[in-house]
């Protein structure tokens, strides 16, 4: 018999009755029923009930054990009476009568219990993450993650992709976030960077003649934390392909992602048809470039109904160039109480409020419009709005106006809130969409032209497109959205040096800077680069959706907290003076 166990704690059943066995695991729970001890013994695989009475040689020692002690049990398998069978346990037909006990590891008093799923403060959970991970839900999340990664690998291999590893220590490059810098001991004053993504390396793999690449890649970005984003590092399914156009990438990747959600989605519906939605349409209809399509609400432009109307705020607003009025339909939302609640929501998001109209049957049985806007614009305009939006009795619509970039994001959040409040957002399904035709450039906070997405993407129209207004240039860039989250981002790459130099020039990077920052890739492109493209899928977010978790930390083994601190390992930490001397660094105190 093995030194520690003959079976796991999920393995024994009625077929083992009468056998002598050895089990090892953690004491999950102890119950004393008047001279009979019941111990739930837990390991990675499951739970087995162990019993001992006063006649058992192990009884006295078993009375001393406490929760989360690690013990080894010798005993005999007994069948449970029919009335005592526990159908919730794989081992619920049997129990093990203990004849021997060895304590393998005692446990101090627990700062948080493992038994049960009681919520504890995040600080406690992350400080004692090894205990937190013993809890059933979190343990299941980590196993889900492991199985998802295994399935991703298998599916990529089956699709003809090859897995290659790229460097973890590399040069800094501008890819949309702050780098984590690593000082060089051998080259004082110089720094490496942890890669924000394997972007340049995977493109170089294509230039080197390998056709289909993938990697489960760690990525490092010094970012502000969000519920769906780690502040320091994350893992992605990194993909690149040679001799492809945009649709080729979609055809290769879509079956992999759909298969993962079908395999691990717990029966939730996965639509086979994934629409392509242009970025501008996504912002117009949904107020987001990662729309939640479970919500059927689609916003519309209704400017003409307010131009020259009696509602002076909107009418005057529309006199300014680049402004418009948008409506958010709210089917079944036609009550003043609901409209006031949504107006308060808009105010909580930083807006003065939202105008609204709701429709009801009047005393004469005819349809009538109510609400502040209805009184100002009159029945003809309100009826035209109702017909355009396809609304009827008991429905409402909310209105926002201005330059779209000033209110689109809030409109999108209001759309989501309305869908949730009215029960319109579909449950138990995954709704995907490819968002395409992203703008190549945007203006930053200082009004300067900068890349809006990935700087390595090919502009639609090539060099000719870059000769005009940069803010009108579209790129071969795309995202995959699912249920309001961005799961994939990618693009067809700019593999022509002359177009790359021009693209960077428009964003304020002279050729010398491009050569300095991306010299390796530019050099490679001068020796015959194939057209290529790819994408990266966020593994953490995929698992978060599959596990139905609201916070990404629930699917990461050892996550940082909101302040980018590892409370268990004490990171970040202060270096020793010796370490600083070796690196020829000194710490400059804050002002």
UniProtKB/Swiss-Prot annotation:
Q: Which residues bind L-aspartate?
A: 175, 221, 453, 493
Binding of ATP occurs at 221-223, 486, 538-541
GO MF annotation, one:
aspartate-tRNA ligase activity
List the catalysed reactions.
Answer: tRNA(Asx) + L-aspartate + ATP = L-aspartyl-tRNA(Asx) + AMP + diphosphate
Species source reads: Cereibacter sphaeroides (strain ATCC 17025 / ATH 2.4.3) (Rhodobacter sphaeroides)
The identity of this protein, by name, is Aspartate--tRNA(Asp/Asn) ligase
Chief subcellular location equals cytoplasm
Q: What is the lineage of its organism?
A: Bacteria, Pseudomonadati, Pseudomonadota, Alphaproteobacteria, Rhodobacterales
The UniProt entry, under Gene3D superfamilies, shows: Bira Bifunctional Protein, Domain 2 (3.30.930.10), GAD-like domain (3.30.1360.30), Nucleic acid-binding proteins (2.40.50.140)
Instruction: Describe the function of this protein.
Output: Aspartyl-tRNA synthetase with relaxed tRNA specificity since it is able to aspartylate not only its cognate tRNA(Asp) but also tRNA(Asn). Reaction proceeds in two steps: L-aspartate is first activated by ATP to form Asp-AMP and then transferred to the acceptor end of tRNA(Asp/Asn).
Keywords recorded for this protein, A-Z: Aminoacyl-tRNA synthetase, ATP-binding, Cytoplasm, Ligase, Nucleotide-binding, Protein biosynthesis
Aspartate: region residues: 199-202
Q: Which domain of life is it from?
A: Bacteria
């Amino acid at each position: 018999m093995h030194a520690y166990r003959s079976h796991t704690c999920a393995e024994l059943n009625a077929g083992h009755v009468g056998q002598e066995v050895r089990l090892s695991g953690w004491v999950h729970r102890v119950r004393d029923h008047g001279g009979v001890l019941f111990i739930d013994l837990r390991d990675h695989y499951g739970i087995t009930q162990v019993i001992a009475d006063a006649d058992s040689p192990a009884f006295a020692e078993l009375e001393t054990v406490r929760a989360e002690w690690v013990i080894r049990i010798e005993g005999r398998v007994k069948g449970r009476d029919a009335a005592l069978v526990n159908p919730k346990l794989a081992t619920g037909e049997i129990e093990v009568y203990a004849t021997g006990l060895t304590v393998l590891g005692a446990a101090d008093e627990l700062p948080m219990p493992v038994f049960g799923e009681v919520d504890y403060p995040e600080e406690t959970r992350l400080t004692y993450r090894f205990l937190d991970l013993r809890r059933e839900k979190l343990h299941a999340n980590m196993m889900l993650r492991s199985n998802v990664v295994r399935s991703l690998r298998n599916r990529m291999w089956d699709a003809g992709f090859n897995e290659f590893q790229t460097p973890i220590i590399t040069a800094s490059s501008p890819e949309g976030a702050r780098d984590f810098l690593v000082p060089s001991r051998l080259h004082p004053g110089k720094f490496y960077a942890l890669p924000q993504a394997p972007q340049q390396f995977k493109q170089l793999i294509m230039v080197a003649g390998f056709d289909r690449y993938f990697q489960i890649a760690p990525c490092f970005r010094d970012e502000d934390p969000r519920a769906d984003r780690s502040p320091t590092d994350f893992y992605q399914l990194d993909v690149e392909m040679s001799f492809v156009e945009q649709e080729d990438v979609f055809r290769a990747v879509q079956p992999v992602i759909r298969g993962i959600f079908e395999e691990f989605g717990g029966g939730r519906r996965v639509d086979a048809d994934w629409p392509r939605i242009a970025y501008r349409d996504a912002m117009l209809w949904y107020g987001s470039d990662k729309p939640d399509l479970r919500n059927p609400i689609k916003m519309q432009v209704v400017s003409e109904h307010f131009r020259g109307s009696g509602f002076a705020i909107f009418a005057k607003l529309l006199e300014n160039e680049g402004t418009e009025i948008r409506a958010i339909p709210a089917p079944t939302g036609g009550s003043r109480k609901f409209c006031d609640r949504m107006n308060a929501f808009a105010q909580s998001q930083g807006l003065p409020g939202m105008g609204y109209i709701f429709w009801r049957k009047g005393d004469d049985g005819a349809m009538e419009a109510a609400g502040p806007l209805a009184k100002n614009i009159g029945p003809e305009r309100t009826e035209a709005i109702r017909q355009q939006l396809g609304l009827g009795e008991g429905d409402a619509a909310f209105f926002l106006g201005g330059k779209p970039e000033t209110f689109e994001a809030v409109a999108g959040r209001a759309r989501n809130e309305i869908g949730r409040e009215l029960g319109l957002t579909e449950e138990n399904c995954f709704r995907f969409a490819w968002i395409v035709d992203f703008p190549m450039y945007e203006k930053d906070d200082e009004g300067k032209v900068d890349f809006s997405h990935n700087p390595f993407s090919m502009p639609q129209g090539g060099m000719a497109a870059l000769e005009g207004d940069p803010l009108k240039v579209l790129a071969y860039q795309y995202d995959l959205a699912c249920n309001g989250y961005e799961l994939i981002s990618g693009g067809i790459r700019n593999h022509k040096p002359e177009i790359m130099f021009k693209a960077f020039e428009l964003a304020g990077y002279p050729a010398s800077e491009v050569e300095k920052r991306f010299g390796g890739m530019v050099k490679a492109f001068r020796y015959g680069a194939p057209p290529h493209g790819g994408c990266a899928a966020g593994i953490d977010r995929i698992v978060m959706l599959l596990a139905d978790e609201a916070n990404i930390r629930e699917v990461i083994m050892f996550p940082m907290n909101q302040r980018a601190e590892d409370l268990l390992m004490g990171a970040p930490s202060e270096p020793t003076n010796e370490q600083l001397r070796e690196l020829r660094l000194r710490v400059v105190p804050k002002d």
